[in-house]
Every structure is written in structure tokens, then in C-alpha cells.
């Protein structure tokens, strides 16, 4: 008798083995085992039926548990490494310094109301409002601090693919785009009334972003909106008139994502043709192309000036570009499971490998040190730009299904008015000194950084991670 098992456990194991042998047509082996066990095990057809399949279930359970144990051991090792490298002083500094904050499990809130996958999220630049769009055709407005649903905004007739806050000075708007080929503008100060619908694209509109105030030479600063579409074009809109003022053609396939520079001079866009393009908005022409991805590009991001010192080191520059320069470094995420970092000339700086599935969204930390990414592998990954882009934190099982979107709450702007007077999705508007030099809009007090991110998923949930 095994010393590891009690008499009852041994008897159940024998019955399970006999039932298994009988189920796989090894009747002679089953008969032999029963004969050898003799009176120690009483088993009939009913007992065989009862124990049939039990051995396989226990075997698969053990395999699952072993995998879970390995995952937990890996997480524990990562946390221990993080703890070992920290001192009480550095831990205190991290707690006080928002530039060092990174999200960690569990989320502060899990927001549930959508009836189909969540495709996009966006933070109000001033208030604690969070907008989410879904394949269920609705936009939900949440109070992310309280974790409560404020309202459901209806108007689109097909999936909502992207949302963004921004607009002219003095009045923040919410823009949304959809598979119904339209862009809609909503007024948060008037119960999210639909104030304008922008038709014009010939296929699904996959991304929409307000262009920040201060676009060089533009008389419509703050009034511009850019959209990207499956019709292979980017369109620039005047939100006050609803007119399309410019169409940018050059991509040869679906344009899935677009990001404007902080001063509104440049657009960075990419999609199914695997070739990101940096557009000069005033000239309406491509300034640079970026070659390297091996599959569809799902997301793009422009690095803030705070990241320039770290990215300059990675790219081998002796000194970083001027903080007043608005489009020096970029990030792209792809279905090839990689994230790639680029300079403005189209040179590949670094390839980040770690995700096990499509990379769906990117966000640079406002403090400049980190890049965050989410993926269909259900994780959030935090990459440290000061450590050769080492992945310093992984939040596993962020959602129960593919993670489709990620947004960082924009920094609070000190002069924001009651209507949310800020740049695109809270991007600080570029300012000018008395001598005419442009100041770094990210050089504001660190206290303005909001340590809040939101993610959305195919599991129909929005999750908020915050201090």
C-alpha cells in the first residue's frame, strides 16, 4: 500500500484505473488488475460507469494546476526582483512621484454595461468622465472616480470604432466614428447632444482625433479633427462648419490609426499596408515612411518631449532633440506581436518583443520614462525606455478576453476652464514665451499628471487602473 495515499484514496485510484482501462477497450488488463487486487476492491458495472473519465479529469486538472503554479512562480519572481531592486527611499519616491507610477492589479473599477466588445475609450480633459465605444453601437459615459455609469449616448447605427475629447478653446467636444461611415460630434455641456454629423468617408471610419491648438499657420487652430478610414484616406475636418477641408491620400490599404503631434503640425498614421507615414499637415504630403513590420499595424503613438532624452540614447544621438520639436520619435504596434520605436527619419530604433498576440494599443507615460501596451494576449505590459526598453511590469489577465484599447488620462491643465478648455484629449496646448520661443508643454508641474489609465476588451468591460 502506498504511504502517500489513505486506504480510501488507494481504493478510488484502483477503481479509476480499472474504469479507464475498460473505457479504452483494454478489458484483459482491467480483468488482470481486478484479479490481482482481489477482495481489496469491489467493482461492478455501475462502479465502472461512476468512475469512467475520472482519471482523465484528474490528469488534466494536474496539468492545468502545474501551468498555473509556473505562471504564479514567474509573477512572484518578477515582483521579488522589483522589490529587491527598490530601497525604502525609492519606494517612497515612487509613491510621491507620478512620473514613476505604473498601473498594477487589481483595477480600481470594472465598468459593465456594454452588450458587445468595447472598442475604444477616452478621458475628458478636465472632469472625471470616461467615454467608451462598443460594437453595440453605443457610447457610454462613466464617472471613472466613482465607477458609475452616467449616461448612454445613442446615434450611430453600426459599431463605434473610436472616440476622442477635444475641440476649440472654450468648449470641449466628444467625437466618435463608426462603421456606419460617419463621424459624430457630441456636446458634453449639453447632455451629450449630437451637434453635428460628418459624412464623407466611403468606408468604415476607424480612428478619430482632435488636432491640438497651435497648428502652425492654421487660422482654424483648435477647430480641426482628423479621421482615418478603411477607404485608405485621412480627412481633416473643421468641426465648426462640418466641412472636410483636406483629404490625405497615400496609404494603399485600410488606415486603422492616426495620432496628431502636440502642436498640430504633423500626423502619424498606419494600417493594413504595414507602412506608417508621417504627414506634414500644412503641405499635405508624406514626410517619412517607416518600413519593418510584417503584419497589419493596429496602433500608433507619438512620443512626448519628456521621452526624448531616453529615446535619444536608444537611437545613438549625442544629445536629445529640442523639447519644442513636436514629432521626433514614434511607436507602432502590430499583429506581428511586436512594438517598434522609430525616429522622425524613418529609422528603426528598437523592436520590443514580449506579447504573445496582436498588439492593440499603445500609450506613452506622460513622465516620459515608460511605454505601455495592451494585446490580445490579455496583458498590459510596461516597457522602461531607460533600461533598453525592458518589460518591467506585466499585468496578466487584465481582462477575460482580448484587450482592445488603452488610454492614459491626460494631464490636468491649470488654466482649463469650466468647459474643459484643453487640447486634444487633454493634450496641453503648446505655449509661447515672451521672446517667441515655444515652450515644452510637458514641462508643467508633475502634479498635473493624472495616474489613471483605462482599458477595454472583447469581454464587454472597461477597467480603470488608478492610484
Curated annotation (Swiss-Prot):
CDD domains: WD40. It comes from Aspergillus clavatus (strain ATCC 1007 / CBS 513.65 / DSM 816 / NCTC 3887 / NRRL 1 / QM 1276 / 107). It is found in: Cytoplasm, Cytoskeleton; Cytoplasm, Cytoskeleton, Spindle pole. Dimerization mediated by the LisH domain may be required to activate dynein. Its main location: cytoplasm. The gene is nudF-1. Positively regulates the activity of the minus-end directed microtubule motor protein dynein. May enhance dynein-mediated microtubule sliding by targeting dynein to the microtubule plus end. Required for nuclear migration during vegetative growth as well as development. Required for retrograde early endosome (EE) transport from the hyphal tip. Required for localization of dynein to the mitotic spindle poles. Recruits additional proteins to the dynein complex at SPBs. Pfam families: LisH_PAC1, WD40. Residues 60-87 form a coiled coil. PANTHER family: WD REPEAT-CONTAINING PROTEIN POP1. Residues 417-437 have a biased composition (Low complexity). Residues 417-441 are annotated as: Disordered. This is Nuclear distribution protein nudF 1. SMART domains: WD40 (SM00320). The keyword Signal does not apply. WD repeats lie at residues 113-154, 156-196, 200-247, 250-289, 292-352, 354-393, 398-428, 429-466. One of its GO terms (biological process) is cell division.
